[in-house]
Amino acid sequence: MKEVIDTVGRRKTSVARVFMTPGKGRVIINKLPVEEYFKDEVRRSKALRPLALTERTEEFDIKVNVQGGGITGQSGAVSLGIARALTEFDETVRPILKTEKLLTRDPRMVERKKFGRKKARKRFQFSKR
């Protein structure tokens, strides 16, 4: 068994590099405690959901470097990274995480803007005359 488990999680344009070591349950994201980084309870619970489901919140110290995107994409990226790290540490948690779809990379990305349109799908205002 490796001492440090490192995995990558992605969501939209966010990339999270997760480093998991056996410890006391500290979660550090970009050198800040998770409570400071994700001030919103919804984003924080989304990011830490794999730990809560597998009931391993106090077993590991997790250090995360996350960059790109917004706060929602980053919380999704952290969640995927933690889920992958837990699976790498212990294969028995895989079915639990898989049923909750926490091991699946969300493929949805922002659709590009097309020419002749205001946004990706929105058209310019139509003028009859």
Swiss-Prot record:
<dbReference type="GO" id="GO:0006412">
    <property type="term" value="P:translation"/>
</dbReference>
<dbReference type="InterPro" id="IPR020574">
    <property type="entry name" value="Ribosomal_uS9_CS"/>
</dbReference>
<keyword id="KW-0689">Ribosomal protein</keyword>
<protein>
    <recommendedName>
        <fullName>Small ribosomal subunit protein uS9</fullName>
    </recommendedName>
</protein>
<dbReference type="InterPro" id="IPR023035">
    <property type="entry name" value="Ribosomal_uS9_bac/plastid"/>
</dbReference>
<dbReference type="InterPro" id="IPR020568">
    <property type="entry name" value="Ribosomal_Su5_D2-typ_SF"/>
</dbReference>
<keyword id="KW-0687">Ribonucleoprotein</keyword>
<comment type="similarity">
    <text>Belongs to the universal ribosomal protein uS9 family.</text>
</comment>
<dbReference type="InterPro" id="IPR000754">
    <property type="entry name" value="Ribosomal_uS9"/>
</dbReference>
<dbReference type="GO" id="GO:0003723">
    <property type="term" value="F:RNA binding"/>
</dbReference>
<dbReference type="GO" id="GO:0015935">
    <property type="term" value="C:small ribosomal subunit"/>
</dbReference>
<dbReference type="GO" id="GO:0003735">
    <property type="term" value="F:structural constituent of ribosome"/>
</dbReference>
<dbReference type="InterPro" id="IPR014721">
    <property type="entry name" value="Ribsml_uS5_D2-typ_fold_subgr"/>
</dbReference>
<dbReference type="GO" id="GO:0005737">
    <property type="term" value="C:cytoplasm"/>
</dbReference>
<dbReference type="Pfam" id="PF00380">
    <property type="entry name" value="Ribosomal_S9"/>
</dbReference>
